[in-house]
Amino acid sequence: MLYIVGIGPGPGYATERAIRAIEEADCVFYEDYTGPIDVETLRRAAKTPPIRLTRRDLEDESGRKVLECLREGKRAVLATAGDPMLATAHAALIAAARARGHPVEVVPGVSIICAAFSAACLSIYKLGGVATVTYPRGGVYSTRPYELAEANLARGLHTLLLLDVREDGSFMPPRDAAEVLMALEERERRGVFTPQRPAVVVHRLGWGGGVVVGPLGAVAKWDGEGPAVLIIPAQLGPVEKECLEAVAQRI
């Protein structure tokens, strides 16, 4: 039996079902390249020391270590930060396990998408879509965040932007994301990511972080660290505006 378990964005977010799955497992694996994970919770609940899997373990080797545990007739857990099904690597592991005749249960967790909108007091009904801000590869910038935000703003919808993970496993800080977005504006020049564009940063949620709000130009100078997400809000409703101002630090 394979359990794909999300334990939320930080300490204290794991559900009772997630803890029970970890307690019942013979092998507990976790990955921390899609988000920082509360390893201490895993250690307290697991029968044996949790085993860290790298991106290479899951993607290049197709989760071989997890599949070996299953082949021995054991219960295996792959624990992730947030909600487990936001990463395609986890879907590939599910398919591989089922193809070998192993039953699979997905244990949902609190996703960064829901948590970020809740923390910032924004209406989930106005979420227009999600894109990832990436560092340029070979000098080439992905225009997906620009195109999505442009379409969403025209429709009165908020845009949630996930941030890149570096090759060394560290997370893109919000200031780098703001620089990338403004560099896209220099190329596209359609007024989407100007230095004056309002932005909401939800950073280190569950790890002592919080919510900050300010124009992209100010975010580019802010020294907060990742992991974080950026939200490019459309026009805020009265309740959204009042609540965001109450919970956010202005920069």
Curated annotation (Swiss-Prot):
Keyword terms, alphabetized: Methyltransferase, S-adenosyl-L-methionine, Transferase
CDD domains hit by this protein: DHP5_DphB
Pathway(s) where this gene product acts: Protein modification; peptidyl-diphthamide biosynthesis
Pfam families: TP_methylase
Binding, S-adenosyl-L-methionine: D83, L86, S111, I112, L163, L205
EC number annotated for this UniProt entry: 2.1.1.98
GO MF terms, alphabetically ordered: diphthine synthase activity
Record has Magnesium as a keyword: no
GO BP, one annotated term: methylation
Record SUPFAM superfamilies: Tetrapyrrole methylase
Domain of life: Archaea
Function, as annotated: S-adenosyl-L-methionine-dependent methyltransferase that catalyzes the trimethylation of the amino group of the modified target histidine residue in translation elongation factor 2 (EF-2), to form an intermediate called diphthine. The three successive methylation reactions represent the second step of diphthamide biosynthesis.
Family (UniProt): Belongs to the diphthine synthase family.
Assembly information from the UniProt record: Homodimer.
Name assigned to this protein: Diphthine synthase
Species annotation: Pyrobaculum calidifontis (strain DSM 21063 / JCM 11548 / VA1)
